[in-house]
């Protein structure tokens, strides 16, 4: 079976074609970073308009690279949510239209399920069950994963997502958009131990998280110490260390609560080198394993949507004609899009 995946939930247009026997046949991605850079963040209307321009050409390019025709496809998967409603509607409209024209099922995919399953595209995929740490610009959550579609949310951020905190803190420090990766790079030049940031909500039981207070702490630290280059690097180091420590502490608790030994980390922040290293240390300490996707599949992409869509298609999770998008869609309520 073959399926095409369409990702348009935010500011990346991603298209991929996946074969359940041969694996990934093609993968195309267009990033809108330059489009939004002058605004310091994603402008939803601009994002939607750009998806309209880029999606069809990328679909043609992906099909040409994979050497497939519409007759070779068994389904069209698209991100149905969560995300920016206008951006989602572009992908949903195109996806459902193509499914109708090609007489194949339309398969709505949950964006975070796509991230969660992205490591399955690797040569050494994680076996079920495992604990997933999903860390992106819009979501940060810990999920117990028993199998595909069997998810239990263990904890999540009650305010800013980790990726959002990285980007907002980077903006406070005068870094360009998107600031998260730039802050991480600046942190590599930082001096360990000069500044000590709090580890929010780690002094109490539970698996929920909070990162918004770290922005205020960063602003106060800058105000008290200046913003010369080395000080900025030291602050970046302390901020990143606080976020990573918090995530690792919560991961450890989640593993203890579930009795599991395997951790999957996915989403844009899963590309962070420090977070990966810290989770590797945790896994080694407890005799566990940590899995994550290759860097290009950490951020939004069509490959993860195509893979997740294939699993949904095999399970019969397809939708009738009619347009639906879910800007807000809990990952433990996946069946609601078909109803």
Curated annotation (Swiss-Prot):
One of its GO terms (biological process) is tRNA threonylcarbamoyladenosine modification. Keywords: Acyltransferase, Cytoplasm, Iron, Metal-binding, Transferase, tRNA processing. InterPro entries: ATPase_NBD, Gcp-like_dom, KAE1/TsaD, Peptidase_M22_CS, TsaD. It is an enzyme of class 2 (transferase). The keyword Metal-binding applies. Binds 1 Fe(2+) ion per subunit. GO terms for cellular component: cytoplasm. Its EC number is 2.3.1.234. Its main location: cytoplasm. Substrate binds at residues 134-138, 167, 180, 272. One of its GO terms (molecular function) is iron ion binding. The keyword Transferase applies. It catalyses: L-threonylcarbamoyladenylate + adenosine(37) in tRNA = N(6)-L-threonylcarbamoyladenosine(37) in tRNA + AMP + H(+). Fe cation binds at residues 111, 115, 300. It is found in: Cytoplasm. Its cofactor is Fe(2+). Belongs to the KAE1 / TsaD family. Required for the formation of a threonylcarbamoyl group on adenosine at position 37 (t(6)A37) in tRNAs that read codons beginning with adenine. Is involved in the transfer of the threonylcarbamoyl moiety of threonylcarbamoyl-AMP (TC-AMP) to the N6 group of A37, together with TsaE and TsaB. TsaD likely plays a direct catalytic role in this reaction. NCBIfam families: gcp_kae1, T6A_TsaD_YgjD. This is tRNA N6-adenosine threonylcarbamoyltransferase. It comes from Vibrio cholerae serotype O1 (strain ATCC 39541 / Classical Ogawa 395 / O395). The gene is tsaD.
């Amino acid at each position: 079976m073959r399926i095409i995946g369409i990702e348009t939930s935010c500011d990346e247009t991603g298209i991929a074609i996946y074969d359940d026997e041969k694996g990934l046949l093609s993968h195309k991605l267009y990033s809108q970073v330059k489009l939004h850079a002058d605004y310091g963040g994603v402008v939803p209307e601009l994002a939607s308009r750009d998806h309209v321009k880029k999606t069809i050409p990328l679909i043609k390019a992906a099909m040409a690279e994979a050497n497939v025709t519409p007759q070779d496809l068994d389904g069209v998967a698209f991100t149905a949510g969560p995300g920016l409603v206008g951006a989602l509607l572009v992908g949903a409209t195109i996806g459902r239209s193509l499914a109708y024209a090609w007489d194949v099922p339309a398969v709505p995919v949950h964006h975070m399920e796509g991230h969660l399953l992205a490591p399955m595209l690797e040569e050494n995929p994680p076996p079920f069950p495992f604990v997933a740490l999903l860390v992106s610009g819009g979501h940060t959550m810990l999920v117990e994963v028993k199998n595909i579609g069997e998810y239990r949310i263990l904890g999540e951020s009650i305010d800013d997502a980790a990726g959002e905190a990285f980007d907002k803190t980077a903006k406070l420090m005068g870094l360009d958009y998107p600031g998260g990766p730039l802050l991480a790079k600046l942190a590599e030049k930082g001096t360990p131990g000069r500044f000590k940031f709090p580890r929010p909500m780690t002094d109490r039981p539970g698996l929920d998280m909070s990162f918004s207070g770290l922005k205020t702490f960063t602003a106060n630290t800058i105000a008290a110490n200046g913003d010369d280059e080395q000080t900025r690097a030291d602050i970046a180091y302390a901020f990143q260390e606080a976020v990573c420590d918090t995530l690792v502490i919560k991961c450890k608790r989640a593993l203890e609560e579930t009795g599991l030994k395997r951790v999957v980390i996915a989403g844009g922040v899963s590309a962070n080198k420090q977070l990966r290293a810290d989770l590797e240390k945790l896994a080694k300490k407890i005799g566990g394993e940590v899995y994550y996707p290759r860097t290009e599949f950490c951020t939004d992409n069509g490959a993860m949507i195509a893979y997740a869509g294939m699993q949904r298609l095999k399970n019969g999770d397809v939708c009738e004609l009619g347009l639906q998008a879910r800007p807000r869609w809990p990952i433990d309520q996946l069946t609601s899009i078909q109803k």
